[in-house]
From Swiss-Prot:
One of the record's GO molecular function terms: identical protein binding
Protein name: Alpha-1-antiproteinase
Top-level taxon: Eukaryota
Tissues showing expression: Plasma.
Domain characteristics, as noted in the entry: The reactive center loop (RCL) extends out from the body of the protein and directs binding to the target protease. The protease cleaves the serpin at the reactive site within the RCL, establishing a covalent linkage between the carboxyl group of the serpin reactive site and the serine hydroxyl of the protease. The resulting inactive serpin-protease complex is highly stable.
CDD domains per the UniProt record, alphabetical: serpinA1_A1AT (cd02056)
Subcellular location: Secreted
A Pfam family reported for this protein in Swiss-Prot or TrEMBL: Serpin
InterPro entries: Serpin_CS, Serpin_dom, Serpin_fam, Serpin_sf, Serpin_sf_1, Serpin_sf_2
Record function comment: Inhibitor of serine proteases. The primary target is elastase, but also has a moderate affinity for plasmin and thrombin.
An annotated GO BP: acute-phase response
Amino acid sequence: MAPSISRGLLLLAALCCLAPSFLAEDAQETDTSQQDQSPTYRKISSNLADFAFSLYRELVHQSNTSNIFFSPMSITTAFAMLSLGSKGDTRKQILEGLEFNLTQIPEADIHKAFHHLLQTLNRPDSELQLNTGNGLFVNKNLKLVEKFLEEVKNNYHSEAFSVNFADSEEAKKVINDYVEKGTQGKIVDLMKQLDEDTVFALVNYIFFKGKWKRPFNPEHTRDADFHVDKSTTVKVPMMNRLGMFDMHYCSTLSSWVLMMDYLGNATAIFLLPDDGKMQHLEQTLTKDLISRFLLNRQTRSAILYFPKLSISGTYNLKTLLSSLGITRVFNNDADLSGITEDAPLKLSQAVHKAVLTLDERGTEAAGATVVEAVPMSLPPQVKFDHPFIFMIVESETQSPLFVGKVIDPTR
């Protein structure tokens, strides 16, 4: 009799909770090739960026009329961790689908780099609140391979929990409670249902809360039009302020580029295309341009209008990642024997959810008043009143934490 297939479950959760600031710096032209690439975690930052762009373009291909928001950091961490328990073509597909070239970087270096990157992101002394977590939920009768347990704990700081998957409601509650606690209540009931033959669950979350150095004044926020498309306009609370910004117009992208730094090591990059140029922006934007923007700051005065918004994205990663070449792990040919030798496993579900809130001050009130000098000449008005793209990156490594596209800030 052929062995039955038990199913593993992979869940991913991500949160971004923003409180705006501005930090302007003068910078000269810098060769991006001169960056210090010595730390271990820098070995994978370029791969993470490649994966972020690949996944973004796949999401645009599926729908160019919907908001997009996801955490490439969360997704790659979870699947890289899963690869530790995979073998043969299953492992090769996962790592190559995550944009790792195994002829250029040894697999051991990939996991070592994730280990150091997670340590960097979770620094307790950082002014930025950025926490990641990885949870392994194992059926109480399932025996995991000791080497797998050891490697995911050492490299990915994961926790292991014994769960009775025969009681699907209780198992679902344990998993959802873990995510809700890790994201400080921002993501609840992530897991709507469990397949009846689930015996293993892998959960990743990322929680981010950043504060702008110079918050917008809430008293200046006014309702204004946001042009979703040529025929659709919605009313949104529009923040505004006059000041000095890291901002310039990029003719290559036909877009305004705005960079806003957080207290700590993170930067938000917003790209506002000219009317009718969104597709051009999406086709032309590269990781090298992003790197150049971060290194070559251009400070100018402007009157900035920016919408308050709260968006989220929930994605079936089985569909998305299959389009990027990761297929075997989801079918009966999957080789996950590095996780358990008790029974064949395959990945039955892969869910990713990310949430973003952006407002004047964020979740913590700002008590400081900031006064800054601006040139006497009339500064330009830059209005983020139509669809735009943004990324939030960890400044030291330029690793993409979150990627998004705002089509309609009211949805």
